[in-house]
């Protein structure tokens, strides 16, 4: 007897947090017996998981919805842009249903409505325990919370994803262990505000002892990182705001429990601009803490992101930012030109910076940081570093050191002269022989 299995097309846009949402939806679809396909034409329904963070992302999402409608006609929309249903309906009124971010149950209800769950499920015994993953098998994103309590004037995330909502620590650890047991070698911890984990919960909940694998633990970030560090995999922290308790993470890094890597979105170094952004932090205190962190953990890699051309930014403000870069000597830095976002307070602020000035400052910023990054990478030459293997081809190995997150940082190009049996996901020793502004070269 032939059984018909419905086909669902799927498009995932946006940041790693949205990717985790996509993985959750795909896991639910596969568990219910739906077949996931990479095309629109043969799909019984198409789901588009959108991004709505900045206007360019909104445009990309609207274009993806339009392509799906043109090629198929039966489209569900979810994700951050889904929180702005009127915006979507104005452009694409024929979309069947729209839900906001992390609305897994609503998405599945809509799928069942338009494409009923198949009576026969060919995947009932083959859905992996760790769920469907969109990343390579050797690394995975681990989302520890939803939403954000900050009210940064350039951002609309709280209006899209809501206030901070931390997952129970035992639930996170269960997922992390499943991933590690499935062969994942690197966990990338993500959220909108990783260092705020559990701060949305009552003191009673934070201090309450719970048990995981028979071990008594508390519900806080430090304990979470300590326990993740027992799983035998790389643990990399992203989106870590510089709260005071972040200092307590550095000894864990120095001891090798979690990777010596901090992704801290500092955004600017002018007190005036930071105040206008509604961003916390004393620049002098940040510099002092960076110095202390590096004394405790000399191998610490610091990544950050900054915005140039924020409304009201003068040449003096920008120079303060350049001065900060020179003193902080950050390893990895991303820079964005301020972009108006529909619904963000900063969009309507006075003293908007002309586009040509933004571009000029962006170029000066990047030139300086490239010099800093190149100098810091030069210090790695002659040393041996652990490298996780991402790709293998006839020219050699491409991997990442402990200082490199996937997609946003550099890579290590390796001449494989002594380890013919190297496989993707292996962690190997590489002696560094050359460096440029972003990448390293070496031999194993």
Curated annotation (Swiss-Prot):
Main location as per UniProt: cytoplasm
* UniProt domain Radical SAM core: residue ranges: 134-375
Localization, per the record, is: Cytoplasm
Q: Which Gene3D superfamilies match?
A: Methylthiotransferase, N-terminal domain (3.40.50.12160), Nucleic acid-binding proteins (2.40.50.140), tm_1862 like domain (3.80.30.20)
Which Gene Ontology CC terms are recorded?
A: cytosol
Instruction: Kindly list the cofactors needed.
Output: [4Fe-4S] cluster
Instruction: Name the Pfam families on file.
Output: Radical_SAM (PF04055), TRAM_2 (PF18693), UPF0004 (PF00919)
Q: What is its EC number?
A: 2.8.4.4
Give the matching InterPro entries: Elp3/MiaA/NifB-like_rSAM, Methylthiotransferase, Methylthiotransferase_CS, Methylthiotransferase_N, Methylthiotransferase_N_sf, NA-bd_OB-fold, Ribosomal_uS12_MeSTrfase_RimO, rSAM
Q: GO annotations under biological process? A: tRNA modification
Q: Where is the MTTase N-terminal domain?
A: 6-116
- Protein residues bound to [4Fe-4S] cluster 1: 15, 51, 80
Q: Which keywords belong to this entry?
A: 4Fe-4S, Cytoplasm, Iron, Iron-sulfur, Metal-binding, S-adenosyl-L-methionine, Transferase
CDD domains from the entry?
A: Radical_SAM
Q: Which reaction does it catalyse?
A: L-aspartate(89)-[ribosomal protein uS12]-hydrogen + (sulfur carrier)-SH + AH2 + 2 S-adenosyl-L-methionine = 3-methylsulfanyl-L-aspartate(89)-[ribosomal protein uS12]-hydrogen + (sulfur carrier)-H + 5'-deoxyadenosine + L-methionine + A + S-adenosyl-L-homocysteine + 2 H(+)
| Segments forming domain TRAM | 378-444
The residues the record assigns to binding [4Fe-4S] cluster 2 are: 148, 152, 155
Q: How is the cofactor bound?
A: Binds 2 [4Fe-4S] clusters. One cluster is coordinated with 3 cysteines and an exchangeable S-adenosyl-L-methionine.
A single GO molecular-function term is: 4 iron, 4 sulfur cluster binding
Query: What PANTHER family does the record tag this protein with?
Result: RIBOSOMAL PROTEIN S12 METHYLTHIOTRANSFERASE RIMO, RIBOSOMAL PROTEIN US12 METHYLTHIOTRANSFERASE RIMO
Homology family: Belongs to the methylthiotransferase family. RimO subfamily.
General function of this protein: Catalyzes the methylthiolation of an aspartic acid residue of ribosomal protein uS12.
**Under what name is this protein listed?**
Ribosomal protein uS12 methylthiotransferase RimO
Q: Which organism is it from?
A: Actinobacillus succinogenes (strain ATCC 55618 / DSM 22257 / CCUG 43843 / 130Z)
Lineage summary: Bacteria, Pseudomonadati, Pseudomonadota, Gammaproteobacteria, Pasteurellales
